[in-house]
From Swiss-Prot:
Additional facts recorded: Acts as a key regulator of synovial injury and bone erosion during autoimmune joint inflammation when its activation leads to enhanced recruitment of inflammatory macrophages and neutrophils to the joints.
Entry keywords, A to Z: Cell membrane, Disulfide bond, Glycoprotein, Immunity, Lectin, Membrane, Signal-anchor, Transmembrane, Transmembrane helix
Name of this protein: C-type lectin domain family 5 member A
Tissue: Constitutively expressed in monocytes and macrophages.
Subunit (UniProt): Monomer. Homodimer. The majority of CLEC5A is expressed as a monomeric form on macrophages. Interacts with TYROBP/DAP12. The interaction with TYROBP is required for CLEC5 cell surface expression. Interacts with HCST/DAP10. Forms a CLEC5A/TYROBP/HCST trimolecular complex depending almost solely on TYROBP.
Topology within the bilayer: Single-pass type II membrane protein
GO terms, molecular function: carbohydrate binding; virus receptor activity
Function: Functions as a positive regulator of osteoclastogenesis. Cell surface receptor that signals via TYROBP. Regulates inflammatory responses.
Cysteine-cysteine disulfides: C68-C79, C96-C180, C158-C172
Domain C-type lectin: 75-181
Location in or out of the cell: Cell membrane
CDD domains registered for this protein in UniProt: CLECT_NK_receptors_like
Segments passing through the bilayer: 5-27
Length: 185
């Protein structure tokens, strides 16, 4: 008998079992479901009206689907659409809503890197707004943004990403392209 071949085969089997165990152990933690709800505030003059008086529920980071509509980019179970037309932040939100999506919530480093790679040299609105009453940035799902925004000033309550590879404050009334996001099917 060739003991070297048998031992090599056993080592390969053990490594496969260990690898599969780690995969099954960490898969739910990496791709676990996080449901959040968004309820817009109705304070005129602070940030744009997002969805009127309706509530919107969606899962911003998780989906096990793999199919996106034509013209959308797939990343980690989500579909992303980069508009070619420029609109105000409110009109960008409405544009995404008509496509069954929302402005992108860039809440992981992987998603940020992916969007920076596909956005090129353009600036795109995302779903991040400054809340002057709270003096903090919030995503449209009402979660707090813990990063930093460049060039924030009095009337720059919306955010773009793209050209500079950073989160840049922008006027909500200036026209930019937008990034829409929804679950893959």
């Amino acid at each position: 008998m060739n003991w070297h071949m048998i031992i090599s085969g056993l080592i390969v089997v053990v490594l496969k079992i260990v690898g599969m165990t780690f995969f099954l152990l960490y898969f739910p933690q990496i791709f676990g479901e996080h449901n959040v709800s968004f309820s817009p505030t109705e304070r005129p003059g602070t940030v744009p009206q997002i969805f009127g008086s309706s509530n919107v529920s969606f899962t911003p980071t998780e989906s096990f689907g793999t199919v996106c509509p034509t013209g959308w980019d797939f990343h980690q179970g989500r579909c992303f659409f980069l508009s070619t037309s420029e609109n105000s932040w409110n009109n960008s939100m409405n544009f995404c809503k008509q496509k069954g999506s929302t402005l992108a919530i860039v809440n992981t480093p992987e998603k940020l890197k992916f969007l920076q790679n596909i956005s090129g040299a353009e600036k795109y609105f995302i779903g991040l707004l400054y809340q002057p009453a709270e003096k903090m940035w919030r995503w449209i799902n009402n979660s707090v943004f813990n990063g930093s925004v460049i060039s924030h000033s009095h009337n720059f309550n919306c955010v773009t990403i793209g050209l500079t590879k950073t989160f840049d404050a922008a006027s909500c009334d200036v026209n930019y392209r937008s990034i829409c996001e929804k679950s893959a099917q």
